Curated annotation (Swiss-Prot):
Protein's name according to its UniProt entry: L-Ala-D/L-amino acid epimerase
UniProt cofactor(s): Mg(2+)
Native species: Populus trichocarpa
Listed InterPro entries: Dipeptide_epimerase, Enolase-like_C_sf, Enolase-like_N, Enolase_C-like, Mandelate_racemase_C, Mandelate_racemase_N_dom
UniProt family annotation: Belongs to the mandelate racemase/muconate lactonizing enzyme family.
Cofactor descriptive note: Binds 1 Mg(2+) ion per subunit.
Enzyme class: isomerase
Source organism superkingdom: Eukaryota
Additional remarks: Part of a large, functionally divergent protein family. Protein modeling and substrate docking were used to predict the substrate specificity, prior to biochemical analysis.
Gene3D superfamilies according to UniProt: Enolase-like C-terminal domain, Enolase-like, N-terminal domain
SMART domains reported in the protein's UniProt record: MR_MLE (SM00922)
Binding, substrate: 193, 218-220, 328, 380-382
SUPFAM superfamilies with a match to the protein in the record: Enolase C-terminal domain-like, Enolase N-terminal domain-like
């Protein structure tokens, strides 16, 4: 189970009443205090993340959740599932000082453990807990949320609640999230995903994305090896200078994954990343593909579905089973994501940040985190671009592949709550 205690340990400190570490390693600095509200967040002094959790008192006035249903431009097909519309859960938390935080629990069948109905029930339980709790420190609130929404089983809902809480706190101390997470940058550049489609459709999408300024295409593969190669050839013809990420979503056997790399090698194509080539529980196969991909073809392999907890991350690191870990908040929660970031950075493993099929609420939170930390080699935060409607008001600014984050408090996105039914 992820806990605030384990997070504090990863930050180089321990929760009271335990003695603090002798060699603290703060993960990030945060800006401002509640007393500094209204000041310029770029000009205020800093204090450590653990201090915010230990000193900021959270007093929840209202907390509620509603279904967040949004149509897609086209069905989103990957090796393990097909999504025809987004059926997520929106979460709204209001503090006693009037600051409102927004979160989203993304649901992707066969990837997240929850479906929408389960997520609604568990989110409601968490909201009731928050409403009925007395004022307590942020760290304790997050720990209580983790207890009622434990492990990977409820990670997506936990992430949504954590997002809303942290967004509200950021607004209360008058800082944007990218500053809260370290302030490394106020923008990111994302790839864009081409789902499993025909070679003609893939070529059409690649041509469109090229005109929109996307230099990195993430191609979903893993259902049919021959068709995957044909799609790659079609994309290469219309976007010859693009960088490729292959994402098999567990779809290949180890020998098939290596065969794909061999065929691409013959075409003169080297992907910059090969994501989750084999089944999540095929640890031996993952390590084998990673060794061959890097040693023979110079291709890095990322663990996505195989990394659903800090325990998984440690296993991957110890066994040299992948070159990159893909952090998705819906898999591990926000607190869990921070734990894995610290573990990976300490070990020298590269990091990727991704998401499920989400609106700009969840994607905005993840984008702020990525910009603030500045430590992600691969950024895959594109799925709001696949939606036919955008229910989120304000938030980050989009210019092709670039997301720009402003100085607005929190992640700055919100919903017209009366129209979220």
């Amino acid at each position: 189970m992820l806990s605030i205690g384990s997070l504090c340990l990863s930050l180089g400190t321990t929760p009271k009443p335990l003695k603090p570490s002798k060699t603290p390693k703060p993960i990030r600095k945060l800006y401002a205090t509640k007393a500094m509200a209204g000041s310029n967040p770029k000009q205020v002094s800093t204090f450590e993340f653990r201090d915010l959790m230990e000193t900021f008192a959270v007093d929840v006035k209202r907390a509620e959740n509603r279904p967040l249903n949004v149509p897609l431009i086209a069905p989103f097909t990957i090796a393990s599932s097909r999504l025809d519309k987004v059926e997520n859960v929106a979460i709204r938390i209001e503090l006693s000082d009037g600051c409102v935080g927004w979160g989203e629990a993304p649901i992707l069948p066969f990837v997240t453990a929850e479906d929408q109905s389960t997520a609604m029930i568990k989110a409601r339980e968490a909201c009731e807990l928050l409403k009925n709790s007395s004022s307590m420190k942020l760290g304790l609130v997050l720990e209580r949320v983790s207890e009622i929404l434990p492990g990977h089983e409820f990670a997506s809902v936990r992430a949504g609640v954590e997002m809303a809480l942290i967004d509200a706190v950021a607004k209360s101390i008058n800082v944007p999230l990218w500053i809260l997470f370290g302030g490394a940058s106020d923008s990111i550049t994302t790839d864009i995903t081409i789902p499993i489609v025909s070679s003609a459709e893939a070529a059409e999408l690649a041509s469109k994305y090229r005109k929109q300024g996307f230099q990195t295409l993430k191609l979903k593969v893993g259902k049919n090896l021959k068709e995957d190669i044909e799609v790659l050839q079609a994309i290469r013809a219309v976007h010859p200078d693009c960088l490729f990420i292959l994402d098999a979503n567990e779809g290949y056997k180890p020998e098939e994954a290596i065969e794909v790399l061999e065929e691409l090698h013959k075409m003169g194509v080297t992907p910059i990343l090969f994501e989750q080539p084999v089944h999540r529980d095929d640890w031996e196969g993952l390590g084998h593909v990673t060794h061959i991909a890097k040693g023979k073809y110079g291709v890095s392999v990322a663990a996505d579905e195989s990394c659903r907890s800090l325990v998984d991350a440690k296993r991957i690191i110890k066994g040299n089973l992948a070159d990159v870990i893909n952090i998705k908040l819906a898999k591990v929660g926000v607190v869990g994501g921070l734990e894995i970031i610290e573990e990976a950075r300490t070990s020298g493993l590269d990091l990727m940040i991704g998401g499920m099929v989400e609106t700009r609420l969840a994607m905005g939170f993840a984008g702020h985190l990525a910009a603030g930390f500045g430590c992600f080699k691969f950024i895959d935060l594109d799925t709001p671009l696949l939606l036919s409607e955008d229910p989120v008001l304000e938030g980050y600014e989009v210019s092709g592949a670039v997301y720009k984050f402003t100085d607005a408090q929190g992640h700055a996105g919100f919903l017209d709550w009366d129209n979220v039914l």
